[in-house]
Amino acid sequence: SGGLQVKNFDFTVGKFLTVGGFINNSPQRFSVNVGESMNSLSLHLDHRFNYGADQNTIVMNSTLKGDNGWETEQRSTNFTLSAGQYFEITLSYDINKFYIDILDGPNLEFPNRYSKEFLPFLSLAGDARLTLVKE
């Protein structure tokens, strides 16, 4: 359950960011986060295979205060990822919302609650091995 953090990332309004890789064989969860830092996340995209009370659920949220500042979650049970499989997620955003395109899966939207136009921080954490990050 390693993690990757990229700082000084050039993810601005109108650009696309694609991350891909392989899900572990017995996953609990993995998340993709974009924002200004680990404590200021405009999008927390958490795939929960089997985590707490959640099974096969995508949870999206945001925070300006790290773990003490989580806002209202948005959830989707349109869950198409599975253990051991390749995944690819493409993100883009504008001043109002994020657009999330999961390969062979749902297209989701999430509000850009803080109206940020420059998100230099990317992190990936949890039960997946990253093989692709491209802008």
Swiss-Prot record:
Its job: This protein binds beta-galactoside. Its physiological function is not yet known.
Residue stretches making up the Galectin domain: 3-135
Listed GO MF terms: carbohydrate binding
Residues modified as N-acetylserine: S1
Annotated organism of origin: Conger myriaster (Conger eel)
InterPro entries: ConA-like_dom_sf (IPR013320), Galectin-like (IPR044156), Galectin_CRD (IPR001079)
Record-listed a beta-D-galactoside binding positions: W70, E71, T72, E73, Q74, R75, S76
Keywords attached to this entry: Acetylation, Lectin
UniProt cross-references to Pfam families, sorted A to Z: Gal-bind_lectin
Protein name in UniProt: Congerin-1
Assembly description: Homodimer.
